[in-house]
């Protein structure tokens, strides 16, 4: 299927083209993009906004206790409260030139969040990524966000958004950890082949090296597809693993939302200076 990345300022604009156009990166290389992770509470959000990050990632949920009058809030489970609502978060982030990635752990907050985003759309002339884990993945839980309901709800508001669609995963230091299987990538492609938007697949750094053939197959299925390599807090993986991944895939198709010290070591090894950041 042909690429459907949007034009300048659209929510589906390729983030490399967006940040190149704004002179914030120097090459079409996914490793140049800096991430600020879990910018949920006001202090975290403010730190992210002041940072050199290009993309701000935050987590959205609906309070189960009925607080905030049913408004979506910015928090990552197991947290269920926050000093920041999505409405307040958007009002601050819109003043910046940063791209946005919103992560949903359940369907509950999706529709209400799309309504707030819709109200801000004319002020958000930048890439917007909407993320959910829609399939069970390696060592992961079967508790996923319903793919059809999620995609239908988001697309009904924003046919031009960029989707970030992942698998639930686990990683255990004492066990053999399975990678992304052929059935996992084929099921993901089956779902995404019906879409016209760009899709990035968040993949867990510690599981990627052993899954490179499967993930490369997935990327070859559409030029709308990319990978976003992320890491769990206690995962064990090496800079060599990241360099292997970088050599295996096209540099324009892989982003790295990874933690320290590997992030700094990786950027140093590939000659990208001043890019030690993952809040």
UniProtKB/Swiss-Prot annotation:
Family matches, as Pfam families: Menorin
Disruption phenotype: Mice show a degenerative retinal phenotype at week 15, characterized by patchy pigmentation of the retina. They have no photoreceptor function from eye opening. During development of the eye the correct number of cells are produced and the layers of the retina differentiate normally. However, after eye opening at P14, eyes exhibit signs of retinal stress and rapidly lose photoreceptor cells.
Protein name (record): Protein FAM151B
InterPro entries: Memorin
Signal peptide: none
Family, similarity comment: Belongs to the menorin family.
Membrane-traversing stretches: none
